[in-house]
Amino acid sequence: FIKNLADIAPLIMIPGNHDGNLKNSSRQDAITPIIQALDHSNIHFFKNSGEFHATDDLCFNILSVFDEDNWIDPTDTNKINIALYHGSISNCKTDIGWVMEHGEHELAIFRKFDFGLLGDIHKAQSLDFEGRVRYPGSTVQQNHGETNDKGFGIWEIQDKDNFTYRHVELLNPKPFVTIE
């Protein structure tokens, strides 16, 4: 799957809380050996916090859950700065509608970034009114507690103020269903 994605376009990846030991960040995560074995020039994997200047106009800012002490604000505000983060943000919602009032961080961590692309929460949702900070959700229904409207998001970002987002739903041929 990872190789197939990287064959299509540059792939930027960060690990999440299930990919390693958050209490021992120096321990090997589950993704690094896979990335090393693939040895693909189009895969950019970042376990540590920092910036990845993808183009002259675009910077990905990694806010790693394994390296929170080294989070930084954007260093070039002329670029489009996109924060990448895998974790819960206060007031995000789960598939069953439960609001996580106390996430690992507040939405304010993204205030200096132009956009925020998030992972961890499986329900697709925007966390701000403008739609700049989003969870795309998961690509497949994981269990009976999740809805079946899974898929992925497509951002089209022309500049800091002109962007669109759309959710593309994937057909699940074998959904979890409950018969009462």
What is each model feature region?
Residues 17-19, 49, 64-66, 87-88, ...:
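Active-site metal-binding loops of divalent metal-dependent hydrolases
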Residues 1-51, 109-113:
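Core catalytic region of metal-dependent phosphoesterases/phosphodiesterases
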Residues 19-22, 53, 90-91, 124-125:
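Short, active-site-adjacent cap segments at secondary-structure transitions
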Residues 13, 90, 95-161:
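Conserved beta-sheet core of the metallophosphoesterase superfamily
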Residues 54-108:
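Binuclear metal-dependent hydrolase catalytic cores centered on His/Asp/Glu-rich metal-binding motifs
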Residues 51-61, 77-82, 130-133, 155, ...:
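Beta-strand-turn-beta hairpins that frame and shape the catalytic cleft
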Residues 157-180:
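Accessory, non-catalytic peripheral segments of nucleic-acid enzymes
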Residues 43-44, 58, 114, 133:
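Short, conserved active-site loop motifs that form the nucleotide-linked donor/cofactor pocket
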